[in-house]
C-alpha cells in the first residue's frame, strides 16, 4: 500500500471503445414528432405521410400532394419559372431563397396549375412549407391570383391546399399587399359563381389564414392542423387568460363553426370528388356553384 504512494501514476486512462453503430443515410428514417416512433421514410411516403402508428399528418411536399389528389398525368403547371427577387434589398434574402430552391426543388412556396380530379377539371394551388415556411411574398400572391383568374376564365372550380407561416417579412408591405390581391381575385371569382374549395393543412397561420385560406365556399382541414392568425402566447398575453389545450387546432375550429369538415388525408380525394360532382352542372353554368 505504502509503495503505491511513490509509484508514478499513468497520465492516461484506457477507455473501452463502444461498438461501432452502422450509419444510416440521411432521409432513410423519419421520427414522428407526436408519438416519437421511428419509421422508414419510404413507408411513410407510401402512406401519404400519415404516421403508421398514431395517424399524425406529416407535412406533404407540394408535388406529392398534387399526385395524391389529381388524376395521373392530368396536371399542367402554371408559371413554373416565376421566382422572387429582393425588392427591399433585405440582407441575405437572395441566399436564403437559393438555399430553399436547392433543398425543396421548387422555385417558390406554391405550385399552381390545372388538372382533373376523378374526371372533374379544376385549377389548383398547393403551398409547400419547406420553402421559406410557406410564407407569402409577391410571387406566391401573384401565382395564386393568376390561378384564380385562369379558373375564372375557363369556368373551372379552384382548389387550394394551404400551409404557411404567414406573410414574408423580407418583402415588407409588398407581401401584405398579397392578402388584398388574392382576396380580390377570389371575390370576383365568387361573384360570378365560381366554386372555391380551401383545404387548410398544418400550419396555416398569419396573413394566409386571414385572407384566401378562409374564403372558401367549403373550408376543410386535415386532422390536427394548426390554424390561426396570431400565436398562442401572444393571444394569452393580450387577453390575460389561459387558452384551451386544443385552441387553434382544426378540431377546435370545427367545433366552433369555422370549418365545414376535418378530413383524414386518406379520404380527402374521395370527399373532394363528391363535392365536385355535386356542383358539376350542365349547360352554361358548367362547374359552378349555381
From Swiss-Prot:
GO terms for cellular component: acetyl-CoA carboxylase complex
Catalytic activities: N(6)-carboxybiotinyl-L-lysyl-[protein] + acetyl-CoA = N(6)-biotinyl-L-lysyl-[protein] + malonyl-CoA
Organismal lineage: Bacteria, Bacillati, Bacillota, Bacilli, Bacillales
Segments forming domain CoA carboxyltransferase N-terminal: 28-290
Enzyme class: transferase
Gene3D superfamilies attached to this UniProt entry: 2-enoyl-CoA Hydratase, Chain A, domain 1
Gene: accD
Binding partners and assembly: Acetyl-CoA carboxylase is a heterohexamer composed of biotin carboxyl carrier protein (AccB), biotin carboxylase (AccC) and two subunits each of ACCase subunit alpha (AccA) and ACCase subunit beta (AccD).
Cysteine pairs bridged by disulfides in the record: none
HAMAP family with a match to the protein in the record: AcetylCoA_CT_beta
Cofactor(s) of this protein: Zn(2+)
Source taxon at top rank: Bacteria
GO BP annotations listed: fatty acid biosynthetic process; malonyl-CoA biosynthetic process
Annotated protein name in UniProt: Acetyl-coenzyme A carboxylase carboxyl transferase subunit beta
Cofactor remark from the record: Binds 1 zinc ion per subunit.
Record organism: Geobacillus thermodenitrificans (strain NG80-2)
A Pfam family per the record: Carboxyl_trans
